[in-house]
Curated annotation (Swiss-Prot):
Subunit structure of this chain's protein: Homodimer.
Cell compartments where the protein resides: Cytoplasm
Keywords assigned by UniProt, alphabetized: Aminoacyl-tRNA synthetase, ATP-binding, Cytoplasm, Ligase, Metal-binding, Nucleotide-binding, Protein biosynthesis, RNA-binding, tRNA-binding, Zinc
Region (Catalytic): 242-541
Gene Ontology molecular function, alphabetical: ATP binding; metal ion binding; threonine-tRNA ligase activity; tRNA binding
TGS domain mapped to chain residues: 1-61
Protein name: Threonine--tRNA ligase
Residue sites binding Zn(2+) per the record: 337, 388, 518
Uppermost EC category: ligase
Residues annotated as signal peptide: none
Function: Catalyzes the attachment of threonine to tRNA(Thr) in a two-step reaction: L-threonine is first activated by ATP to form Thr-AMP and then transferred to the acceptor end of tRNA(Thr). Also edits incorrectly charged L-seryl-tRNA(Thr).
Catalyses which reaction(s): tRNA(Thr) + L-threonine + ATP = L-threonyl-tRNA(Thr) + AMP + diphosphate + H(+)
Amino acid sequence: MIKITFPDGSVREYNEGVNGLQIAESISSRLAQDVLACGVNGEIYDLGRPINEDASVVLYKWEDEQGKHAFWHTSAHLLAEALQELYPGIQFGIGPAIENGFYYDVDPGEAVIKEADLPAIEAKMAELVAKKEAVVRRDIAKGDALKMFGDRGETYKCELISELEDGHITTYTQGDFTDLCRGPHLMTTAPIKAIKLTSVAGAYWRGHEDRKMLTRIYGITFPKKKMLDEYLALMEEAKKRDHRKIGKEMQLFMFSDTVGKGLPMWLPKGTALRLRLQDFLRRIQTRYDYQEVITPPIGNKLLYVTSGHYAKYGKDAFQPIHTPEEGEEYFLKPMNCPHHCEIYKNFPRSYKDLPLRIAEFGTVCRYEQSGELHGLTRVRSFTQDDAHIFCRPDQVKGEFLRVMDIISIVFRSMDFDNFEAQISLRDKVNREKYIGSDENWEKAEQAIIEACEEKGLKAKIEYGEAAFYGPKLDFMVKDAIGRRWQLGTIQVDYNLPERFELEYMGSDNQKHRPVMIHRAPFGSMERFVAVLIEHTAGKFPLWLTPEQVVILPISEKFNEYAEKVKTYLKMKEIRAIVDDRNEKIGRKIRDNEMKRIPYMLIVGEKEAENGEVSVRRQGEGDKGTMKFEEFGEILNEEVQNMINKW
């Protein structure tokens, strides 16, 4: 018999070789119907894969990321199976599950697969699903794998196999299709009830631009047709909210191939928005006793070797900068934390000095393949609202509570009222991969759990999801159309203090290692602005929007009066502009609605004579006429009421 430990700490005994489905069946028939995959000691298993030793087990359903992953991974194989029937001789690259669905990279030879072909491929996939084919996992020797795929002319698969170690190779078969794959997968294709292939694109083999361009087919599947219908409706709304489209319409940021791919440039209005966000966070951080620093955009290679970032980002980094005289290597900064560790080391530290809170809006650079770049959410240069807290082990909980306060203020002030968290803890069984003492880990993990409970924060606990250097708390927000975005992280780190030999003198006159806490409420300025645009559809909170008021004279002779109104509003610290183009008033209104400016003030002969403005509110239409001084007072009060909330 073997012992199976569940997430709630309960333990049951089963026969050796029991699988995830059998465990689910022993709990309830409903769970057995819903379960899609299982976690075994932190590794994701197919439901039919045997468990031969004591283990921690988590059962994953559609609602879980791991459940969706198995569902979409099998769907990728289903796509490949359909392509194999429709395009004889087609070769396959890779076909992973991704955040929303899956894709498969294929080489169709002389054939060309276009978007117009997708409905026929979908129909073939549905035909195969109707057969309810079993998905069978097999271990295979490296030589046998090379022969099997070589006999089929699968050059891409043979290249992958040649790089694998013997004894660690598995295949999955459904119907007449067999693929090289680690899994996990569903036990059959039967649960796949709704299929949509979404697009066709080009992708270089293995992401290298000097390799062959393959055809990448994207898709998504669901266990119910209703879910697909809801998803497609969501995608239509998401297109309207695309931050790249709105950012262009509002003139917030731009990209230039001449400057370089993935390198955003902030235009005046976008810069004003970003600086206002930074000033907002600065004020909060000052209240919470942070000290701001500035560090250089590059660092010596030795710094990143010490921190471990060279090993992690070295192959993905930009080319090193060589100093001609000293012969040293420098790299563009991939993270701010190594520099902050050096700042900590600059002075002897006592337990009385802690916690030390260092903050920086630091720009970092990481090389992303061109095919992975996406607007502001995936770029090669971005600015993190980074801070690192150096504290004693007994201060961890208090610091978590303070950071949670900051993140809550940030989210609520941006109208992200719906958010939750995930606590990532150690694997309960395999603890040898984690750095730091058991005592410190247990204290930190308990501190995070208690902090969430004290704040009444809904938090899901995930065992085995912690980084090797410490537990963390990730915040997920739901935007206006129900999408979940990961924004804001608090991460305990026992690794960097060890690597940099950070110390403080304790009350016992002995040297101790501090605990390091990483935190970034925004995550990065670029990603946060992108999410904020899509959440608000560009209609930012009034206090934040780059331009709060646009004044629209109905003809050129009222431009002078419009300028007078603007001057007064600016004296009231209201961001106002005049649209004095020689256009009809209807055209001006439409154009400025596109720019999402909250208030439009229309001025003509009557308004100029009476010192008034006709007020229009974005999305609400005509709000009547009033003295421009009265409007200024009302708007100023509206903004101050928003700011005073935080």
